[in-house]
Amino acid sequence: MINIALVATGGAIGSVFRYLVGVWSMRLAGPNFPWGTLAVNIVGSFLIGLLVELVARRLNASIEMRLFLVTGVLGGFTTFSSFSLDAVSLFERGALGLSAFYILASLVVSIAAVFAGLALGRNLF
């Protein structure tokens, strides 16, 4: 139960940070481009790489610390960082084809799913 609380707390913190970046970018750059989303995806991807290396591998931090920081905070900040880590992990294991498939399938199918969800939502009423 403590693990769920750690992930939930971290997720709440990450979500608030994502919201604040969105507000800040909207005020700074306006609504014509999703700068906030781009920023959290890039920063989140950098941070997940840094934290996995430092917290998990070098500092040998507890599973609770990893759950809070990586799954919780960064998961709440951006799920794109998890996607990026999974793709790089496959690549580093030598599964180049599987990594490429994962990247393409994730992007193409996710975008198609958004279109499908929009279409369904628009046709329900």
Swiss-Prot record:
The keyword Disulfide bond does not apply. It is found in: Cell inner membrane. It catalyses: fluoride(in) = fluoride(out). It is a multi-pass membrane protein. Keywords: Cell inner membrane, Cell membrane, Ion channel, Ion transport, Membrane, Metal-binding, Sodium, Transmembrane, Transmembrane helix, Transport. Na(+) is not transported, but it plays an essential structural role and its presence is essential for fluoride channel function. One of its GO terms (molecular function) is metal ion binding. Signal peptide: none annotated. GO terms for biological process: cellular detoxification of fluoride. GO terms for cellular component: plasma membrane. InterPro entries: FluC. The chain crosses the membrane at residues 4-24, 35-55, 68-88, 100-120. Its main location: membrane. It holds the Pfam family CRCB. Na(+) binds at residues 75, 78. Belongs to the fluoride channel Fluc/FEX (TC 1.A.43) family. Fluoride-specific ion channel. Important for reducing fluoride concentration in the cell, thus reducing its toxicity. This is Fluoride-specific ion channel FluC. It comes from Agrobacterium fabrum (strain C58 / ATCC 33970) (Agrobacterium tumefaciens (strain C58)).
